[in-house]
Amino acid sequence: MSDIKTKFINDPENITAELLEGYALAYPNQVKLAAENIVVRANPKGNDKVAIVTLGGSGHEPALSGFVGEGMLDCSVVGDVFAAPGAQRLFQALQLMDREAGILLVVLNHSGDVMSANMACQLAARKGIKVKKLLTHDDISAGIGANVDDRRGLAGCVPLYKILGAAAEEGKSLDELIEIGERYNKNVATLAVAMRSCTHPQNGGTIT
C-alpha cells in the first residue's frame, strides 16, 4: 500500500486557521478574515441589502468560504474539520453582518449546523438582529419521498448561494429571498457518491 502523502499540512491542530489565512492571502481582493474562522467579503455591499451568511465545517475547501464574494455569500462561518462552528462564533458573525435589510442564514441540513444556527438565531433575536433561516436538504440518498427532513444539505447549496446572492445584490427583500430559496429547495435534488472513504487530517481516522 502506497504511503505517498496526499496533503500539505504544517500542523494538523492548526489546519483550519491556516487554510483560511492562506485563502485570504491568496484572494485579498475577494475575501478577508473578519475574526477567527469568519470569512467576509473584502468589499461589502451596502447595509440596505440583505446579507447572505452560511456555516459549516472545514475540510471541504474551497467550500464554503470560496463562495464568499460579490453576487454570492457575504460571510462564511467555519468550524473545525468536518465539524459545525459553535453557536457563539456564528452569533459573532451575525453581529458583524447586522443591517437594516436583515440577514438570510443558509443552513445545510446537518445536526450540528442546525443546532448552532438555532442557538445563534435565538441570541440574535435578543439583540434585535433581523435574521431568518433557510434550511437546505437536497441529498436524496439520505431521505426518499416524504422524508425531506432526513435529507442532508450538500452540493445543492452552490447554485442556491449564487441565486440568493445575485437577488440580494439586486435589492430583493429578506422575505423575497426566503421565497426564492424555498422554491429552489422544492425543485433540486442531489445524490452523494464517493469512490472511497476520507481520512481525518488530525487523527488519521477513516470517515465513511
Question: What do these predicted ranges mean?
Answer:
Residues 142-151, 161-208:
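Internal, active-site/partner-interface "lid" segment
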